[in-house]
Amino acid sequence: MGGPSANMYRMKGKDERICAKCKKPSCISPVVCKNLNADHTPLLDIYKAVDRLPGIKKSFIGSGVRYDLLLHRYADESLNKAAQTYTEELIARHVSGRLKVAPEHTQDEVLKQMRKPSFSQFGQFKKIFDKVNRQYGLNQQLIPYFISSHPGCTEADMAELAVTPRACISSWSKYKTSRLR
């Protein structure tokens, strides 16, 4: 299971009238819209239903998770709890060994053009990923996807993209840089 925006199942505006008047191109960039119903509970219910099907031992999410939605602090505490529960459930029970996510770049100016969160959020998610792995005695990997030569990306941005992930990942965990090659 998974795909683009894998954890956005049933997410839409709480009040469709507000959405109809909205001129923004994204409900999640540069910040998560207060009108977005970002409840991860319906998706957790699907995971549990799939896992209960006869012949299914375990279901996996391979990629497509928007970690910015999981890290966002919502005004509604029940949404924060659902995001936290989803994050732990995802990492502990629905990763087959590698979870692929798409920070897509390391430079904030390029990421703004892509409507993606700051690369620092990838680091925050990596720390949570590693913590849950330790807590459950797992040895899973978080694999970042990057895009090169995006319009608006300079040669200096590309040079930073070439070195930043290795430097950050080695400082975030005991993950060996040589494993990135």
List each model region and its residues:
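Catalytic cores of alpha/beta
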Residues: 78, 150-167
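Structured loop/turn residues at beta-strand edges in well-structured enzyme cores
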Residues: 94, 168-170
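C-terminal accessory regions of radical SAM enzymes
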Residues: 156, 160, 172-173, 178-181
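Conserved SAM/AdoMet-binding glycine-rich loop
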Residues: 1-143, 147-151
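Generic low-polarity alpha-helical segments
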Residues: 50, 90, 165, 175-176
